[in-house]
Amino acid sequence: MFEIELKNSDEMVIRAKDNNVSINVVQSTINADLKVGMIRGAGEFEIGDIAIIAKSLKGGGVMYRIDVEGIKIGIVGSTAVIEDLDELGPIDILGCSDAKYVPVVEPKIVIPMVNMDFAEIKASVKNEKKLKIKNANSLPAVMEIWNLD
């Protein structure tokens, strides 16, 4: 089981068994309270049981693919172009700043970030403080929007 919440509109926090990882989509940083400090930019990282692939975007910035307990999480900021999204692969949960990414990625859960206008997305909306994921079987069959505030 793990939890996802937003620290603010541009920073997602993932709380797994033994690790907490905070990813800021605007600043392109990963913070996991590591001795080396904050991680900036692209690369592949394993922080305990959380695997992260950070890919540079053509328009600047970084997008993230995070694997936690077999569930794939994508985090995409406003500098991504549609062609960039192919590099994410299949995604279960998408945190993004633009609704145009949603039909391309087709996640089971969308988490609006950076004040994304999600009114045009046809899906049920849940307003909660955090999202708790037990396992892959607990993901919804039909896409949902989780507005974490």
For the regions a protein language model found, what residue spans apply to each?
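Short amphipathic alpha-helical segments and helix-helix/interface helices
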Residues: M63, L85-L88, A99-P103, K122
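Proline-aspartate-enriched helix->loop->beta-strand connector
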Residues: P90-D117
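Core dinuclear metal-dependent hydrolase active-site scaffold
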Residues: M1-G89, I93, E128-D149
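Short, aromatic/basic amphipathic alpha-helical patches
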Residues: F118-K129
